[in-house]
């Protein structure tokens, strides 16, 4: 559970052993889903007995939708099937990956990379690839070149609220397909699997940058540098680069810029106008450019290595 409010701090492992422990906002019971029958049975039970039903894969939900006080939970984390397929429809023909609802972004990335492909997945490797991530939009460091994760979904295999097992795509159950592709996890149906585009892998250019207000000639020059950054951003996005950046307590940090198909020399060229502006403002900075032969290696270099890394441990 991502937000402590939804845990209700009712049973923290850091409490004294003699302190009372209760479920709080956690669910009362959970079903480890193995297939369609488990989902249908849960839906029928909760409707018959007027019990709240929630869906959980990995629990990465800041809004607490993967838990609920007194609820019955469908835990989809064990649906780990994954395969590369040759997909064909009126809207797309080409390679794709079909994953069970329990597959994490890290697992899907490793599977796709072994065959020379990359996927649009999140920074954190333990976030479930389908379900809440892709159906909620799906932010990624590949968004500038490949769009959101939801843009790449070809079809959903789901169980609806009335217990029907269906496939939703632009060609069949299209309203449900569009609702699932950005409408939020656990809202319209229970996802069993998801099929999404994969993209041919390539060299990945990368860069990092940092500067701060302390070493700037003045606060005004630091603010001018920030304004210059806003103006510079579109030039990165327009060529398919995605910078991850932070501003905090007088510090500006770009820990990573991801640019598919670019070399380290390309990154120097891309950043040259902004670095020239920092020099004009008299602001010292630290800049580094580098590259990786493929996206998985780039991910390991910046956010990994998988399965562990600075963002999360393998779930």
Curated annotation (Swiss-Prot):
It is an enzyme of class 1 (oxidoreductase). Pathway: Mycotoxin biosynthesis. The keyword Flavoprotein applies. Its EC number is 1.-.-.-. Keywords: FAD, Flavoprotein, Oxidoreductase. Residues 19-201 form the FAD-binding PCMH-type domain. One of its GO terms (molecular function) is oxidoreductase activity. It catalyses: betaenone C = betaenone A; stemphyloxin I = stemphyloxin II. Belongs to the oxygen-dependent FAD-linked oxidoreductase family. FAD-linked oxidoreductase; part of the gene cluster that mediates the biosynthesis of the phytotoxin stemphyloxin II. The first step of the pathway is the synthesis of dehydroprobetaenone I by the polyketide synthase sthA and the enoyl reductase sthE via condensation of one acetyl-CoA starter unit with 7 malonyl-CoA units and 5 methylations. The C-terminal reductase (R) domain of sthA catalyzes the reductive release of the polyketide chain. Because sthA lacks a designated enoylreductase (ER) domain, the required activity is provided the enoyl reductase sthE. This is FAD-linked oxidoreductase sthB. It comes from Phaeosphaeria nodorum (strain SN15 / ATCC MYA-4574 / FGSC 10173) (Glume blotch fungus). The gene is sthB.
């Amino acid at each position: 559970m991502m937000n402590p409010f939804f845990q209700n701090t009712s049973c923290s492992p850091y409490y004294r052993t003699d302190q009372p422990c209760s479920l709080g906002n956690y669910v009362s019971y959970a079903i480890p889903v193995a297939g369609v029958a488990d989902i249908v049975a849960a839906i029928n039970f909760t409707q018959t007995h007027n019990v709240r039903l929630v869906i959980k894969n990995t629990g990465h939900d800041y809004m607490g939708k993967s838990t609920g006080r007194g609820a019955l939970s469908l835990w989809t984390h064990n649906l780990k099937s994954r395969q590369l397929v040759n997909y064909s429809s009126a809207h797309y023909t080409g390679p794709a990956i079909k994953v069970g609802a329990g597959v994490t972004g890290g697992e899907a990335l490793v599977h796709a990379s072994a065959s020379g492909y990359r996927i649009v997945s999140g920074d954190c490797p333990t976030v479930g690839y389908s379900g809440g991530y892709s159906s909620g939009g799906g932010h990624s460091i590949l968004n500038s070149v490949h769009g959101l994760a939801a843009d790449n979904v070809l079809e959903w295999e789901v169980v609806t609220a009335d217990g029907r097992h269906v496939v939703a795509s632009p060609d069949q159950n299209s309203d449900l397909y569009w609702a699932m592709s950005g409408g939020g996890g656990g809202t319209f149906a229970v996802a069993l699997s998801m099929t999404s585009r994969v993209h041919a892998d390539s060299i990945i250019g990368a860069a990092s940058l940092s500067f701060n207000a302390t070493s700037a000639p003045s606060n005004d020059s630091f603010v001018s540098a920030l304004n210059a950054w806003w103006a510079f951003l579109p030039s990165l996005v327009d060529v398919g680069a995605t910078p991850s950046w932070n501003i905090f307590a007088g510090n500006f940090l770009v820990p990573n810029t991801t640019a598919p198909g670019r070399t380290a020399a390309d990154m120097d060229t891309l950043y040259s106008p902004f670095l020239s502006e920092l020099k004009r403002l008299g602001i010292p900075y630290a800049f580094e450019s580098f590259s990786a032969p493929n996206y998985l290696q780039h991910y390991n270099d910046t956010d990994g290595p998988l399965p562990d890394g600075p963002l999360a441990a393998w779930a």
